[in-house]
């Protein structure tokens, strides 16, 4: 093993959501970075493929009191990588954002965000969240997870 191989995650954890809980998207999603996977990383990164309008079609309102968050929506068309392959309505701080291109949204700690709702869908895309200063699922609390 070389010096930095301990920082490479090729086998994610599947810990956010239960299989069959949401139709039209990967569930559970894949956790690619956490203190459990890379001790001391102190960041939580999870992602999942969306292959249809999810059902239920709603990520609920929530906030991260101690952590900044980035939410990415990544299109899959290699000929037009900026095209998301769908349209999403995302409420951040009480303002509605309409997203139809590959994008990154910065959400400062403490800002209430959600719901996030798909309005249309044309091709698979990836939804990814990165929560800083949160090294565990319980600290990150993605999608309103409360440890239940």
Question: Where are these predicted regions, by residue range?
Answer:
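A short beta-loop-beta micro-motif enriched in histidine and acidic residues
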Residues: 55-70, 78-85
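Short acidic (Asp/Glu) patches
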Residues: 53-57, 92-93, 109-113
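Beta-strand-enriched cores of mature, soluble protein domains
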Residues: 19-41, 68, 75, 116, ...
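A short, N-terminal "cap"/entry segment at the start of jelly-roll beta-barrel domains
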Residues: 1-60
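A short beta-strand-loop-beta hairpin characteristic of the jelly-roll/cupin
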Residues: 75-100, 138-142
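Double-stranded beta-helix
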Residues: 1-12, 18, 118-148
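Extracellular structured ligand-interaction cores
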Residues: 67-71, 85-87, 96, 125-127
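Conserved metal-binding segment of the jelly-roll/cupin
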Residues: 96-119
